[in-house]
Amino acid sequence: MTCDPSTPTIREATQQDAAAIARLAEDAGMGTLTPRGTSYVALSEGRIVGFIRIVKAEGDRYVSPIVVDPQARRLGVGRALMQDARARYGALLFVARGPAVPFYTALGCEQVERERISPDLGEDCDTCPDFAACRHVPMIYR
């Protein structure tokens, strides 16, 4: 697959994108996502190669989740999705899985206290079967 990281097309997701988003989430081990928030998709050569969902809780905007197709990783898709969401909404809060923390740190995200994360979003971590192994880190992208 060819993916030009300098030109991923990002747009708001439509109902027609639901199956591709569900497949990416399932492949990432996230199971079935609950319908909430607003999702945006990244396209390369007309194919969805990633998505980000933004959820509003307690006046803040949260990334919940961001997923990039494994074949499109390290090509700028995740960076483009995060930058686009920040441009649309301002500061973004989220809980990073441990292995993804270096990506977020390189993007300029900072660690925050767990209490900064809305309980509505934090419960996703509390009920996750991978919670103990995940080494989750609450973060903000300003």
Residue ranges, per PLM feature:
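Short amphipathic alpha-helix that is part of the acyltransferase structural core
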Residues: 1-31, 39, 43, 115, ...
